[in-house]
Amino acid sequence: AFLYGVGLQFKMDIRSRTMLVTCYLVPLVFFFFMSGIFISVDPTATETLIASMSVFVVTMSALIGVPPSLGEVYGGEVKKVYRANGVPLYLGVITQFLSSFVHTLIACLIVFAAAPLAFGAELPENVPLYFCALAALLCVTLAVGCLLGLSIKTQAKQTMAAMIVFLPSVMLSGIMFPAEMLPDFMQYLACVFPATTGFRAMTDFQAWQLPVLAAEFLMAAGAAAVLLKIRAE
């Protein structure tokens, strides 16, 4: 039943305009449009292009796409259907999380495959570690997206809150320009956002980075679980 629920959510997301726009259309258009500009401005951008664009895909999909989808589940008729049929409310979060994980990973794989062919981007030095860091960042960011979707009921406020997290994640993490160009206090501020640690782990892996991402995931997931329990009462 659980696998059926995940598969059903995956198929529903394929038909969802929100998922299509936030997970595939906008990130991939940004990738194909901006990659050439990045490389023209800074030829060394080929070294980090795959990681930079993957971080953008992850943050766009998880922070902009997930909250409205969860809002539809827990703010509308779906929640009543869950209760009427005795389905645990947490199932909606888990299926949305797993479905979004797969869709976002597919978009990241498109970037991984297309960047070397289209823009001469360099592959990561250690591909397995790169994908471990990508998966960790994806889990953390999806957990934050779920937290936003559960904590804010109206779609307008969800979008506003998501943008408050999304824009600093993109601008301060180092994917648009070297983080060293930022003032010192903004470099410290950037560390608050998972995208910063994730991008560093994907480009210059250090042993401490994955535990930090794991801790951030546990905090976001724990907060989401508390909110879900409150909503269930």
Which positions does each model-derived feature cover?
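Hydrophobic alpha-helical transmembrane segments of multi-pass membrane transport/permease proteins
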Residues: 12-40, 46-65, 105-107, 162-171, ...
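Transmembrane helix-loop junction
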Residues: 35-36, 72, 112, 116, ...
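Alpha-helical transmembrane segments and their short interhelical loops
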Residues: 89, 97-162, 167, 207-210, ...
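Short helix-capping/hinge motifs at transmembrane helix termini and TM-loop junctions
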Residues: 34-42, 67, 115-123, 152-153, ...
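Hydrophobic alpha-helical transmembrane segments of multi-pass membrane transport proteins
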Residues: 29, 46-115
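Transmembrane helix segments
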Residues: 33-40, 151-192
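Short hydrophobic, aromatic-rich alpha-helical segments embedded in or entering the lipid bilayer
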Residues: 1-7, 177-211
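Alpha-helical transmembrane segments of multi-pass membrane transporters/translocases
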Residues: 23, 27, 33-36, 132, ...
